[in-house]
Amino acid sequence: DISEFVRTMPGVNLTGNTATGQRGNKRQIDLRGMGPENTLILIDGKPVNSRQSERISMRGERNTRGDSNWVPVEEIESITVLRGPAATRYGSGAMGGVVNIVTKKVSKEFKGQVNLYANQPQDSKEGATRRIGFNLSGPIIQDTLGFRIYGNLNKTDADAADINAGHGNDSAAGVEGVRNKDIAGRLQWKISPAQTLILDSSYSRQGNIYNGDTQNSNPRSALVNSLADGKAETARLYRSAYSLTHDGAWEWGDTKNVISYERTVNSHLPEGLAGGPEGSYTGLDFVQSRLKNLRFSSEANIPFKLGVDNVLTVGAEFTDSKLDDPASNSQGFKDQGKTDVFDGISAVRGGKASQRNWAAYVEDNISLTDKTHLIPAIRFDHNSDSGSNWSPALNFSHQIGENWLVKGGVARAYKAPNLYQTNPDFILYTRGQGCPIDAPNSVRCYYMGNGNLKPETSI
């Protein structure tokens, strides 16, 4: 998982999405303390959104490891981290920053390798890791057509169920285990000296090894104990991704046009949707959440001189997201003896939700001197649920000597509500946990999606 590498960089933590500590055994990449929901993960510049297929809890957590484990470490060429205002041009979900995982290029010579890796912790209660992978890359037609393929099998055992013993009856679980299977291929066609066409395809299966986590560290039920003792696989994530990229290198500048499609099937045991047992497994029959993301993007980088050197970047994007998660919409209103209807929301609630987003952005990288750069930018988004938003930004950097680089900036960042938050059929019930708006009086209440939510903004 690349999160273990990224966490060593300045401004990077591994946390949950809130300060509750819920799902603390599944920490995700968090930039500048803004939370994983405000950290955008990219693979070769394309957003990865599989974690969005996981239901969001009352406190804003998700039962997910995030999207940092889809590419084997051996296949990564570099990892770029953008923090704060510099990430504004990437739009919703990048309020904290962006992590771009760049995979290895197609090689000009035919070559391949097999990798074996093992890690055995000194403490026998911590999970060991074993991994095997391969890659093969080279030309099919020299200087015209090339390919790359890689595969990976990885297993990290779960921490022992009693690794945090001493907390009474609470189930403060250790780190959950994971089984990964990945395979990916690339065809690269150099159409002309100025144009390259790249076709990417990948498939991954990610399953867990359960060790007793219940979100709220509830006393373990017989079901939870049985699943933990058997090291059961309680969640299986299947991710398929396809993309077609056209790169152009022209006399006037560079262009990149991308069509990408990502499909995630999130198969997991059903979870409680009310009170303290919310997030704890309640049965043995798997349910599914399906998420589809279609994206078109176009970008041009145009160098020019206006007193000093400039590089103007202009781009546009369109995304279409569709979610179908009927199991997470099964909570009713009957718990308080009322009919299962409220404010026009009937007892028959669907799990389908969709969202579209159109965006355009402009950025100018101005080289005031060889060591000083000024970068004004602006981005416009229109979301089918939450409406329009403008995100201006101004960034500055100055090189001081060989070892020091000073950076600063200001921006209006933006986060659109997710597909659960905007779906009025999505309901959670606090039961005996109290209502956040009147917590001292322990009033019960419902969390409901709202199609009229506005985006979050931050300066």
Locate predicted features.
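Short acidic/polar hinge/loop motifs at secondary-structure boundaries
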Residues: 47-83
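Outer-membrane beta-barrel translocator domains and adjoining extracellular loop/strand segments
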Residues: 124-129, 159-168, 204, 210-218, ...
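Outer-membrane beta-barrel signature, preferentially recognizing the C-terminal barrel domain
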Residues: 222-246, 349-355, 399, 403-405, ...
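Transmembrane beta-strand segments that form the barrel wall of outer-membrane beta-barrel proteins
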Residues: 112-120, 154, 373-383, 390, ...
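Periplasmic-side early beta-strands and strand-to-turn transitions of outer-membrane beta-barrels
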Residues: 107-231
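N-terminal periplasmic accessory domains that precede
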Residues: 2-5, 27-30, 42-44, 66-69, ...
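Extracytoplasmic beta-strand/coil segments of soluble accessory domains associated
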Residues: 3-51, 77
